[in-house]
Amino acid sequence: MIKDNQMFIIDAHSHLWLKQDTTWNNLKIKTSEGNSSRSFFLDQEVQMLPPFMIDGKNSAEVFLSNMDYAQVSAAVVTQEFIDGIQNDYLMEVQRRWPDRFLVCGMCDYFRPGFIRQAESLIRNGFRAIKIPAHRLQLSDKRIMMTSPEMMQMFHLMEDCGIIFSVDLANGDTNVAEMKEIIQECPRLKIAIGHFGMPTTERWQEQIRLARNEHVYIESGGITWLFNSEFYPFPGAIRAIREAIDICGIDKLMWGSDYPRTITAITYRMSYDFVVKSAELTDEEKGKFLGENARHFYGFNNLKKLPYIKNMSE
């Protein structure tokens, strides 16, 4: 429970889509027929959504209901190749609820000429652009984030004040590329997702990137990375404490990775383990759960949401 006037909660990493029907690395991702809460994912059927979302629609309306109940004031909606490019739907979402959502656009980085897509996204009002860098490694090739066209896009984003949202591959795989991007575009605001992949070796190298002025870390996916522990995720708390020691609490933001993570836990549980932790101070919790994201993403007109008692209480 978040008491009145205590803190704003902002989710820095979530996903929305109306239907999955795409391919990545020549493998299919598609909403299942029948029970559409499941999807055929790469080589198996998985529970992609909570089992009661049987229409397969991961809509903003359902997410807002979860956000309101969990007292989450706003959310950043990012993108992933496995969901298909969702630019049209996400812009509709941002236009309908501008005070609740900041959405990320995404280009088809596998096809030359994507800089034109980036220019169009910026013209259409996207304030952030996403690269799922861990998906740029394919069976037969790897797309480098330091290619001439990528660097052209980053310079454009820097000049236009567009945020670069990125999920990196395990450990330090992409760190050298990121260092080059940061050096080349020092004013580019960067949010690194999945908390640096803290269950992999050399994950701290991703966190060290946040020692640069405009680089932040968000924790989207941290509960699935520590899923084997389950709630209250003591390993995740230890990772947060270690990250604080590396780059400071002011550079860290909470993210849920909704909706995939709530196939295992409730939406509130995806941050409640932080609220209840004795290993973090109240000031650290406030910054991590919302204050830092409010500053970084520029959320204005946020409102505090009331606590709604549930029928189990």
Predicted feature locations:
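Catalytic pocket-lining loop regions of alpha/beta-barrel enzymes
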Residues: 127-128, 143-253, 295, 300-301, ...
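Conserved, mostly hydrophobic/aromatic
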Residues: 13, 67, 90, 121, ...
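Histidine-centered divalent metal-coordination motifs
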Residues: 13-19, 167, 194
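Short aromatic-enriched loop/helix-cap "lid" or pocket-rim segments at secondary-structure transitions
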Residues: 20-25, 88, 116-117, 141-143, ...
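Short amphipathic alpha-helices and their capping/turn segments at secondary-structure boundaries
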Residues: 1-9, 19, 115-124, 202-211, ...
